[in-house]
């Protein structure tokens, strides 16, 4: 670097230290992007800019990356560690050519790779985004705009403290040299690809231009679909067309968002304070997959599970910090109260009524509004379960919004539409006490400002929060596979509902929920809750609890549930100490040590957290249950039993294993239990290991309540084969409540009618019921007997006594 540049950089650093405050995306690029610090690194920036270069320098040094202003040595000669892909702006024009010095460096590096087979330099495309404010609809500015000196100065004043250093995945120059050669044309190609990449990054970060709200309403009013229903409504109600048109405008006002970037930017500071006050940390996983989709131009639909009202804020906050545009969020109309409603609306919320039934005008307007969001390229978010889960389990999907998403595709969208399942988890859900009261029968309290204030007074440290992005689902690919002729149903005017729509939407919904559960985050509290709720009297010595946590951790690490599920990196001792600090357990000391237990109220609340991850342990728990019951059992017998029971677990817990994968995964779990010395193996025979029988019993207990529910329903079917769906659900629920009361099963979902509904549907799907819904006893009886054998004598006696009383 020349002396002049060195002096210039020194003079710039002081004002930039005051004017510029940057965040890096990703926040840990060395780990997230797998950057190898042992291999040479060269940075590629979009424009020649000393301000950008110094901003990158500060960020790189903070992140542990090489200083871009330190030279790189090639064959004994020192060269700059950076290239610019265009000369960039001058005072009155812009030169988009690749600078000669950058071209020369590219040629030198590529030739070095041609001459040295072991050379493998890393090219890291890096851009500095000065502000992320989207433009206004109708304006035409480039997505990544070069700035001359005066423009850059103004930008620093306006957005210097709202800047982002965007670091992209590494490009291997060894790969480029081997596959594309090392001549000058490749250098130009690299520069062109980088420019496209930088522009897509900018669009992904700021999003499409925002519409004028009134212009949007006028455009919707003129759409053929809404105009048609307005005329039909006026005619059927015998009122003036203008009156219906005003109603339509009022509905649009009720629904539509009023997105404000300034609220997002300023709200980010408040939310940062809030998360620091509430949580000891936020754990975000697999965000790079979503960034890639955004940069490739996908229409992204986020479909998170719904644990808490906090989900609305948390996901938008996380996406903003991951360099993505916060989505337009479908929120229940119950949240449209002052002052929260207007704030949510400016933060991207659009409001939806609980039911569209009988209101054709509303349903048409809402459908057209959603289609407009997709057509303009705004990312959208809606909660897959419809409402918040009160039990901690993933609920069956509500398919209305999903169906409208597919219908929007049938309007002729020219971009791929991709669902991004999101698992959101907490070590404390603020509403969990309220959920417990509602499950006991208390009426749900309507959301209001007073409720918000009461919640704010309870703010304290709630441990860790988790946002795991699951495996994306391409709707285009799914439709191509399951409805190959779907494009024939495209109609830009009328909403379509072809014959294939309902089964395809149901299939997508099930896949969506499965991918959410695949991305589950086990944590200190959920693991402790799982162990303590499996113990007699809901109590364990500290040593036993630590050992059980270690058992769970080994299962999750050695037989990973999925590629997107996450497991704590800490050991069992550290997890337990962290969980104890959350102040949810009773800690007692005696002469033998410490006992960790749950009081009755906390036992009820802890079922919520256990249910977050119960699916992770469904199969190992069932294997343990079979070994505990039989003392000695063959692997083949275990495989046969699990094949019978698995379809019910799969439907209830959204397990992802296919039938052909089941044998292999069961064998893997058996191997793990043998490895942990929980069971002993002699050839094909398994038996209890008395030295570790306590740990095996605790593992086995996790699935016990699920099997008890199955036994209840199957016993009713055996006794009354012609029992209808509603009667079976009602009678099973009554018996489950009796069992819960008599045997201290302090878990509200144990007698949840919805769970019995899923069981009934699975019985029908699997052929245990005939076309009329009557039990096929030749199939029901063997299954019922197999499951009954796994129950304790006390539970079996209670079920028998209740059935005798009913008779």
UniProtKB/Swiss-Prot annotation:
Enzyme's top EC category: transferase
Subcellular location as annotated: Cell inner membrane
SMART domains: PlsC (SM00563)
Membrane topology: Peripheral membrane protein
Transmembrane helix recorded as keyword: no
Annotated SUPFAM superfamilies: Glycerol-3-phosphate (1)-acyltransferase (SSF69593)
Signal sequence annotation: none
Record InterPro entries: GPAT/DHAPAT, GPAT/DHAPAT_C, GPAT/DHAPAT_LPLAT, GPAT_PlsB, Plipid/glycerol_acylTrfase
Cysteine disulfide partners in this protein: none
Pathway: Phospholipid metabolism; CDP-diacylglycerol biosynthesis; CDP-diacylglycerol from sn-glycerol 3-phosphate: step 1/3
CDD domains attached to this UniProt entry: LPLAT_DHAPAT-like
UniProt motif (HXXXXD motif) ranges: 305-310
GO molecular function, one term: glycerol-3-phosphate O-acyltransferase activity
EC number per UniProt: 2.3.1.15
Domain of life: Bacteria
GO (cellular component) term, any one: plasma membrane
A Gene Ontology biological process term: fatty acid metabolic process
Annotated catalysed reactions: sn-glycerol 3-phosphate + an acyl-CoA = a 1-acyl-sn-glycero-3-phosphate + CoA
Domain characteristics, as noted in the entry: The HXXXXD motif is essential for acyltransferase activity and may constitute the binding site for the phosphate moiety of the glycerol-3-phosphate.
Family (UniProt): Belongs to the GPAT/DAPAT family.
HAMAP family, sorted: Glyc3P_acyltrans
Protein name per its UniProtKB record: Glycerol-3-phosphate acyltransferase
Species assigned in the record: Aliivibrio fischeri (strain ATCC 700601 / ES114) (Vibrio fischeri)
Taxonomic placement: Bacteria, Pseudomonadati, Pseudomonadota, Gammaproteobacteria, Vibrionales
């Amino acid at each position: 670097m020349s002396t002049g540049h060195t002096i210039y950089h020194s003079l710039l650093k002081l004002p930039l230290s005051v004017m510029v405050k940057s965040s890096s995306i990703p926040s840990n690029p060395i780990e997230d992007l797998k950057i190898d610090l042992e291999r040479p690194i060269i940075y590629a920036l979009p424009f020649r800019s000393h301000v950008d270069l110094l901003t990158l320098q500060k960020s790189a040094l903070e992140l542990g990356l090489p200083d871009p202003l330190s030279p790189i040595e090639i064959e004994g000669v020192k060269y700059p560690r950076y290239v610019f892909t265009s000369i960039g702006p001058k005072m009155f024009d812009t030169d988009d050519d690749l600078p000669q010095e950058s071209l020369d460096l590219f040629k030198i590096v590529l030739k070095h790779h041609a001459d040295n087979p072991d050379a493998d330099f890393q090219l890291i495309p890096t851009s500095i985004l000065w502000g992320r404010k989207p433009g206004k609809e109708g304006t035409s500015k480039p997505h990544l705009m070069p700035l001359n000196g005066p423009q850059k100065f103004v930008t620093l004043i306006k957005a210097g403290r709202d800047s982002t250093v965007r670091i992209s995945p590494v490009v291997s120059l060894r790969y480029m040299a081997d596959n594309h050669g090392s001549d000058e044309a490749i250098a130009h190609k690299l520069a062109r690809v980088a420019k496209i990449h930088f522009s897509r990054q900018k669009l992904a970060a700021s999003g499409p231009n925002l519409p004028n709200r009134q212009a949007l309403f006028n455009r919707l009013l003129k759409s053929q679909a809404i105009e048609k229903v307005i005329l039909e409504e006026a005619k059927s109600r015998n009122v003036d067309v203008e009156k219906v048109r005003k109603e339509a405008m009022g509905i649009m006002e009720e629904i539509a968002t009023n997105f404000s970037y300034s609220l997002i930017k300023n709200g980010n500071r408040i939310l940062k304070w809030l998360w620091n006050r509430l949580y000891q940390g936020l754990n975000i996983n697999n965000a790079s997959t979503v960034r890639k989709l955004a940069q490739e131009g996908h229409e992204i639909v986020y479909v998170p599970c719904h644990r808490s009202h906090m989900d609305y804020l948390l996901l938008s906050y996380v996406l903003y910090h991951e360099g993505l545009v916060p989505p337009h969020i479908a929120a229940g109309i119950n949240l449209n109260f002052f002052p929260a409603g207007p704030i949510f609306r400016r933060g991207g919320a659009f409001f939806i009524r609980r039911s569209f039934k009988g209101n054709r005008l509303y349903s048409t307007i809402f459908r057209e509004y959603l289609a407009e969001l997709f057509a303009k390229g705004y990312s959208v978010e809606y909660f897959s379960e419809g409402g918040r889960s009160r039990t901690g389990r993933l609920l069956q999907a509500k398919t209305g919004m999903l169906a409208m998403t597919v219908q929007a595709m049938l309007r002729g969208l020219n971009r791929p539409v991709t669902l991004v399942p999101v698992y959101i988890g907490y070590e404390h859900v603020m509403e969990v006490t309220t959920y417990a009261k509602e499950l006991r029968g208390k009426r749900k309290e309507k959301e209001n400002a007073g409720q918000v204030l009461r919640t704010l007074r309870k703010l304290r440290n709630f441990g860790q929060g988790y946002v795991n992005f699951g495996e994306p689902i391409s709707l285009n690919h799914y439709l191509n596979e399951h409805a190959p002729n779907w494009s024939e149903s495209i109609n830009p005017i009328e909403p379509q509902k072809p014959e294939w729509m309902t089964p395809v939407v149901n299939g997508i919904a099930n896949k969506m929920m499965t991918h959410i559960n695949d991305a589950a985050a086990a944590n200190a509290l959920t693991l402790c809750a799982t162990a303590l709720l499996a113990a007699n009297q809901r109590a364990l010595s500290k040593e036993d609890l630590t050992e059980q946590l270690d058992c769970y951790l080994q299962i999750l690490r050695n037989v990973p549930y999925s590629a997107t599920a996450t497991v704590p990196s800490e050991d069992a001792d550290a997890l337990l100490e962290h969980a104890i600090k959350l102040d949810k357990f009773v800690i007692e000391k005696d002469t033998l040590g410490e006992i960790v237990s749950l009081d009755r109220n906390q036992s009820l609340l802890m079922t919520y957290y256990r249910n977050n991850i119960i699916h992770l342990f469904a199969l190992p728990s069932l294997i343990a249950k079979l070994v505990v019951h039989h003392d000695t059992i063959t692997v083949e017998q275990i495989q046969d039993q699990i094949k019978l029971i698995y379809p019910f677990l799969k439907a209830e817990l959204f397990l992802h294993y296919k039938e052909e994968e089941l044998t292999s995964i069961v064998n893997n779990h058996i191997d793990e239990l043998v490895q942990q010395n929980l069971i002993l193996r002699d050839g094909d025979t398994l038996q209890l290991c008395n030295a570790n029988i306590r740990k095996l019993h605790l593992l086995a207990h996790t699935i016990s309540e699920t099997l008890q529910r199955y036994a209840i329903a199957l016993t009713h079917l055996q006794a009354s084969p012609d029992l209808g769906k509603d009667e079976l659900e009602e009678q099973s629920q009554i018996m489950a409540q009796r069992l819960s009361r008599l045997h201290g099963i302090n878990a509200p979902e144990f007698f949840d009618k919805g769970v019995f509904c899923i069981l009934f549907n699975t019985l029908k799907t699997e052929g245990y019921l005939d076309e009329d819904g009557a039990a096929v006893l030749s199939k029901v009886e063997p299954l019922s007997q197999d499951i009954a054998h796994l129950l304790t004598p006390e539970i079996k006696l209670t079920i028998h006594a209740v059935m005798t009383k009913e008779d």
